[in-house]
């Protein structure tokens, strides 16, 4: 039998017979490791302990102490355990797919009756019984005919369709959890008892089309969350409760910010209060871009398919594009256009107007670009996922030698913006070259080194995601952390060696010859809509004074103060503050309560005493009591507080 060499994390290597399993490798190191092992990582691929290893490579044995591999396995096994529990409780239910996702998993089921909260409780109880039984988990590789015959006998049409989608030559792997079996790539734990029974929870049910296709059957998707221990689960459920209180859709109604309706699914109807936040954020970003030497442009929203074909987007993204057919006068055929799903091809058109010199680079073109992408109706979620959105988009055209400086400048801008907006912490992930890519190894080496160099020069921590870059260049992803610990991927910095070539972007180099520029895609916020949703939830609607749509409400205590109320509002507006009057015939406590629900940061109560003294009684949101100030002093204080952070 041939031998293979396996290298361990400490650099030591051992020879094993080809076909050795990870379990046997663990046993060869120490009995305790074999006992605690749950999976292995082979050349970066997560495998289970039963898989035969055919070739030499780098191996690490994972235990429950290795949080990421452990959580992935726990959640993956729970998806199977849940599907088994459902079919044991309701044998007529058909199973489909059940992937791991952030904090948990989901599984889609075909069932005539809707799952109820009581059903979820019954499923959880059955899952705990399966875990307590410590049923063994095993795997086999089947041929296609055997697998098809099995699923035809079981009456599982969705599994047959999945089977047909597996490419010829790829192994068809079946996993058993006890007597229940599923088609799965793995990996999995060794027995159901390795799943912590007190650290998971089924959270909710939602509708989902089969394979995300609205023309296919509507299924029921059961979601679950899972962690390594009970305390982590409890902390997560507490966070979910807090997140529900902060839900931007609920706060959007209370604060009268925006709404959606069936006549324009996934498109935002901004109300005056919400549009105020949008415009304030846009003005802030525009000032930051001007200061960083970006040139703002505006490009068309409706563009002929010819450009999308040249850029490659027609082939890759056509299903997600809104197509517009136009009868041109005198033309034999309709002209086919598309609402732009992204801005980059149009930005290259602006760059291409006039021959550029190396002295013109870097050229930074920015646009608050309106884009449209078709998203399945089931995937839309308030402002967080919409069909029509505006990106704080910019593209930098530069030489290869300028990538690092441009990257460092962008990270500095992003860091400053996030801090101004209340996000002190963000993480960086560097995704490097995939196997299939465009561009020479030399330019990939240079670009990856430039991105690493920029991050390290700024002394920032980062993770490397090997092989996860786009086919056209390496990228950085930036995840900010909000007030309740959730991560949101917003910022991006992406090198592109492909689009400038496809759209024939050039510049004249110092040598007098024509060269292709590198195109850097970058965004700080991502989209205004989603980022405003994040801001609302981060602040629980209690936005900083400079962003608050209604900064001050001046409320009368008695009708005799109405004239003074309007005088105060006029003075506040003259000072640049967003102020409103409330002279309704209601008690002051009622007015304060109503405006507090609307998250107005400052409420000025005005009665006869304030009229006489030309003062105001100021109540701050979420603070007890009130303070009396002279009118001019109060206006000066609020004006300073309401100044945007970049202008202070």
Swiss-Prot record:
Localisation: Cytoplasm
CDD domains: TGS_ThrRS, ThrRS_core
Residue span of region Catalytic: 247-544
The organism's place on the tree of life at top rank: Bacteria
Pfam family, one: tRNA-synt_2b
Homology family: Belongs to the class-II aminoacyl-tRNA synthetase family.
Listed name of the protein: Threonine--tRNA ligase
Organism field: Paracoccus denitrificans (strain Pd 1222)
């Amino acid at each position: 039998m041939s031998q293979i060499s396996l290298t361990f994390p400490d650099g030591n290597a051992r020879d094993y017979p080809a076909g050795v399993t990870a379990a046997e490798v663990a046993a060869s190191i120490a009995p305790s490791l074999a006992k605690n092992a749950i999976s292995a990582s082979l050349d970066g691929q997560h495998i289970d302990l039963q898989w035969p290893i055919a070739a030499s490579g780098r191996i690490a044995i994972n235990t429950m102490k290795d949080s990421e591999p452990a959580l992935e396995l726990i959640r993956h096994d729970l998806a199977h355990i849940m599907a088994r529990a459902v079919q044991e409780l309701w044998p007529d239910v058909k199973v489909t797919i059940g992937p791991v996702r952030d904090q948990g998993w989901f599984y889609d089921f075909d069932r005539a009756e809707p799952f109820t909260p009581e059903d979820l409780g019954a499923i959880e109880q059955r899952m705990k019984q399966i875990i307590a039984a410590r049923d063994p988990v095993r795997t086999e590789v089947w041929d296609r005919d055997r697998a098809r015959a099995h699923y035809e006998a079981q009456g599982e049409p969705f599994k047959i369709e999945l089977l047909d989608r597996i490419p010829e030559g790829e192994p068809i792997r079946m996993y058993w959890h006890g007597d229940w079996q599923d088609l799965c790539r793995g990996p999995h734990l060794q027995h159901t008892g390795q799943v912590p029974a007190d650290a998971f929870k089924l959270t909710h049910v939602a509708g989902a089309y089969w394979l995300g296709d609205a023309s296919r059957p509507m299924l029921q998707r059961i979601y679950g969350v899972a962690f390594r221990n009970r305390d982590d689960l409890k902390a997560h459920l507490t966070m979910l409760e807090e997140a529900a209180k902060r839900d931007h859709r609920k706060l959007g109604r209370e604060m009268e910010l925006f709404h959606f309706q069936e006549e324009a699914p996934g498109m935002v109807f901004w109300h005056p209060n919400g549009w105020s936040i949008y415009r304030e954020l846009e003005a802030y970003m525009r000032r930051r871009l001007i200061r960083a030497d970006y040139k703002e442009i505006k490009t068309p929203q409706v563009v002929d398919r010819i450009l999308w074909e040249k850029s490659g987007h027609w082939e890759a993204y056509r299903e997600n594009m809104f197509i517009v057919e136009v009868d041109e006068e005198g033309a034999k055929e309709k002209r086919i256009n598309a609402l732009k799903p992204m801005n980059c091809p149009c930005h290259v058109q602006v760059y291409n107007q006039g021959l550029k010199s190396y002295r013109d680079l870097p050229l930074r073109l920015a646009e608050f670009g309106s884009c449209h992408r078709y998203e399945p109706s089931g995937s839309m979620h308030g402002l967080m996922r919409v069909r029509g959105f505006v990106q704080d988009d910019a593209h930098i055209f530069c030489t290869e030698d300028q990538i690092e400086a441009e990257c460092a400048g962008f990270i500095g801008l992003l860091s400053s913006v996030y801090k101004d907006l209340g996000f002190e912490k963000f993480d960086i992930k560097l995704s490097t070259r995939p196997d299939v890519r465009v561009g020479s190894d030399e330019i990939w080496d240079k670009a990856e080194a430039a991105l690493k160099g920029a991050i390290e020069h700024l002394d920032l921590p980062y993770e490397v995601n090997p092989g996860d870059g786009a086919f056209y260049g390496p990228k950085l992803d930036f995840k900010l952390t909000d007030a309740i610990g959730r991560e949101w991927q917003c910022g991006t910095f992406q090198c592109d060696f492909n689009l400038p070539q496809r759209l024939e972007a050039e510049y004249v180099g110092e040598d007098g010859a024509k060269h292709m520029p590198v195109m850097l895609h970058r965004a700080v916020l991502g989209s205004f809509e989603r980022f405003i949703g994040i801001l609302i939830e981060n602040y629980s609607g209690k936005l900083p004074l400079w962003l608050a749509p209604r900064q001050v409400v001046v409320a009368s205590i008695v009708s005799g103060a109405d004239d003074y109320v309007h005088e105060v509002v006029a003075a506040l507006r003259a000072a640049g503050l967003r102020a409103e009057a409330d002279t309704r015939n209601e008690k002051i406590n009622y007015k304060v309560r109503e405006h507090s629900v609307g998250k107005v940061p400052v409420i000025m109560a005005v009665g006869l005493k304030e009229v006489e003294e030309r003062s105001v009684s100021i109540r701050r949101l979420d603070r007890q009591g009130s303070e009396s100030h002279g009118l001019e002093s109060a206006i000066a204080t609020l004006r300073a507080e309401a100044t945007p952070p970049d202008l202070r």
